[in-house]
Every structure is written in C-alpha cells, then in structure tokens.
C-alpha cells in the first residue's frame, strides 16, 4: 500500500550549546501537543554530525495525514492575528532561547517509504543515520525515486542501510529528493563509505543515474534521546 502521508522537514539553527535542550524541548514538550491537537507525528529529531555539514543544527521530520492534514495543521497555526497557535506561546518563548531560525520543506513520500508506524514495527533504527539531499534534473524526482527503489535499495540493503524514507520536495520544480537511512553502527557506516570507492555495484549505480541526478550531498545524523525510532514509541 502506498504511503498516503505528507511530511514537514525542518533544518533548525541552534544557538550556542543548546542543542540537547532544544531536542528535549521539541520531543518531550511539543511532540505530544502536535499529536493530540493536530495529529502531527514526530518521525525524528536528530542532531547533525557537525563534521559532515553545518552545525550546530537539528533535523526534524513530522508526519501528517496527507495534504488535507497539512492544510488543517496550517489553519490551526495561522488562524489567529499573531500567526501563532496561542496554546504554544509559552513553548515558543522557551524555544527562542535555543534556536535562531531554520529552513523547512514539504516532502511527498515515495510509495515504498514506510510510515512512522510501519518503521517502528519493522525495527528501523540506527546508531547513526545518513541524510542525502539530491538535486535532480527538473521534472525527474519521481524518475529518480523509482530508480532508487528498483536499483539502489537492493545494494543499500546489502551494505547495511535501512530506509527511513525517500521523498521528493514539494513546491519546487520536481527537482529535489531527500533520502534518510538508518545504519546500525558507526563501524558499518565506515564500511559503507569505503564501498563507495571499492564496490562495483556502487559504481554501476552512479553511472545509471547520470543524466537524472545532477549532484547530491550527504550528512550524518544521530538520534535525540526520545526519538520514536530509538524508543519504539510514538510521542
């Protein structure tokens, strides 16, 4: 069954040494509110491994019930004159101590992307996660995601990558893909990186996506303490 959800993907700029405080504030205090008031589920709040990209930063991923669920979420947030949910005024005030802003995307999942519930049931989790942003030829995001399922995922599974989700970015020219995978250990991640240069199948995959993928950039993420994939519990 195709995944019917829509996702909000957030890159959060952290102030100083407040990443752990922000991640706890987001998961412990906002996660349950999002679920009960908006049916907005936290897939993950991860810390970016600074050596692999910008820091200090978190990556947040939220699951909603399709486009209508997202529309209801926006109405809930922006209906008032302050353009802010009144019940979250205190939450926002505290969060302002920990973050300075961010950059968000709306993501549409590939049909083979597991929902949060399915990911928990399958035991998808890792000591570390890979987060890949792929720039594709405009109009080719769906093509890339199909190729990913048919040709890359068998290789990825053999190497030790578990798919958390593969998504195309909405509200752009069908030109960006986000792929998040779980890796069981740091040692396994090191083996995967070594395979990029040495594994014949990896080289074949890169040649196959020439003309579809323009460029990509990967970074590493680690779980926050209350991450649902880590605990096996929806917030």
Protein language model regions, located:
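C-terminal/domain-terminus segments
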Residues: 233-235
């Amino acid at each position: 069954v195709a995944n019917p959800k829509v996702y909000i993907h957030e890159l959060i700029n952290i102030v100083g040494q407040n990443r752990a405080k922000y991640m706890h504030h987001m998961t412990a205090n906002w996660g349950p509110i999002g679920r009960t008031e908006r049916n907005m589920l936290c897939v993950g709040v991860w810390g970016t491994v600074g050596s692999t990209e910008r820091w200090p930063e978190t990556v947040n991923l939220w699951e909603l019930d399709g486009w209508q669920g997202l529309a209801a979420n926006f109405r809930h947030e922006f209906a008032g004159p302050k353009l802010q949910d009144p019940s979250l005024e205190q939450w926002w005030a505290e969060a302002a101590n920990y973050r300075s802003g961010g950059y968000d995307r709306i993501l549409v999942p590939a049909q083979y992307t597991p929902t949060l519930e399915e990911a928990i049931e399958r035991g998808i989790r890792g000591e570390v996660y890979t987060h890949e942003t792929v720039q594709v030829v405009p109009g080719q995001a769906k093509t890339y995601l199909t190729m990913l399922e048919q040709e890359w995922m068998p290789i990825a599974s053999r190497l030790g990558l578990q798919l958390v989700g593969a998504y195309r970015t909405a509200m752009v020219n069908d030109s960006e893909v986000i792929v998040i995978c779980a890796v069981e250990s740091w040692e396994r991640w090191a083996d995967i990186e070594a395979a990029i240069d040495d594994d014949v199948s990896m080289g074949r995959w890169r040649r196959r996506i020439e003309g579809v993928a323009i460029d990509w950039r990967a970074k590493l993420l680690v779980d926050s303490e209350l991450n649902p994939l880590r605990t096996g519990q929806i917030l």
